[in-house]
Swiss-Prot record:
A GO MF label: ATP binding
Species this protein is from: Alcanivorax borkumensis (strain ATCC 700651 / DSM 11573 / NCIMB 13689 / SK2)
Residue ranges of domain Guanylate kinase-like in the record: 5-183
UniProt KW keywords: ATP-binding, Cytoplasm, Kinase, Nucleotide-binding, Transferase
Database matches in Gene3D superfamilies: Guanylate Kinase phosphate binding domain, P-loop containing nucleotide triphosphate hydrolases
PANTHER family per record: GUANYLATE KINASE (PTHR23117:SF13), GUANYLATE KINASE-RELATED (PTHR23117)
Protein name, UniProt field: Guanylate kinase
SMART domains, per database record: GuKc
Subcellular location field: Cytoplasm
GO cellular component, one term: cytosol
């Protein structure tokens, strides 16, 4: 029996620290890979195509939607985002876990298609902290920041649809909680049977 990886859906309002937490989680745990989304959003300073996102134009994105190339896709703040269906399926078959950093709309689509996926919502400790983090980025003007804050409350209203809830008040604590979720899922009997097949066979062999 082959060991198949687990698909993790991680959502959070913009500025909650999701990207930093996921990057730290991948650094700590083996066999965890981040799905790189396709987007029509403009590249920000310091970003690289194929590393942060697969940047594309709207026409190309729409063609891929029509071809069924995306596991999920959504429009956020006027930009289109999508997850490659082929890449996710191939990576899970290798036994690696996959993390999708997507909004609640995409999470809803994924859960319907893949009910075995595990969903996690990350909350900021307060709206004031969220606003401070968004302004601290120094990448958006005040109008955009206000739009993001308005969108954040809509996003956060869907927290109850997720399997796990993590509050990013203390970064290391939040990272520990994410790590605990992944490690616990790896100990589920169905996955352990695949990983520990030789051990189980030896233990239960007639002597």
């Amino acid at each position: 029996m082959a060991d198949k990886g687990t698909l993790y859906i991680i959502s959070a309002p913009s500025g909650a620290g999701k990207t930093s937490l996921v990057a730290a989680l991948v650094d700590k745990l083996a066999q965890v890979r981040i799905s790189i989304s396709h987007t029509t959003r403009a590249m920000r300073p310091g970003e690289k195509d194929g590393v942060n996102y697969h940047f594309t134009d709207r026409d190309c994105f729409v063609r891929q939607v029509e071809q069924g190339r995306f596991l999920e896709h959504a429009q956020v703040f006027g930009n289109l985002y999508g997850t490659s269906a082929d890449w996710v399926a191939q990576t899970l078959r290798t036994g690696d876990d996959v993390i999708l950093e997507i909004d609640w709309q995409g999470a809803t689509q994924i859960r319907k298609q893949l009910p075995d996926s595990v969903s996690i919502f990350i909350l900021p400790p307060s709206l004031e902290a969220l606003a401070g983090r968004l302004r601290g980025r120094e990448t958006d003007d005040e109008t955009v920041i206000q739009q993001r804050l308005d969108g954040a409350q809509e996003e956060m209203s869907h927290y109850g649809e997720f399997d796990y809830l993590v509050v990013n008040d203390d970064f290391q604590r939040a990272l520990y909680e994410l790590e605990a979720i992944v490690e616990a899922r790896r100990l589920v009997t169905a996955r352990q049977v695949a990983r520990q097949a030789a051990t189980l066979q030896n233990l239960l062999a007639r002597r």
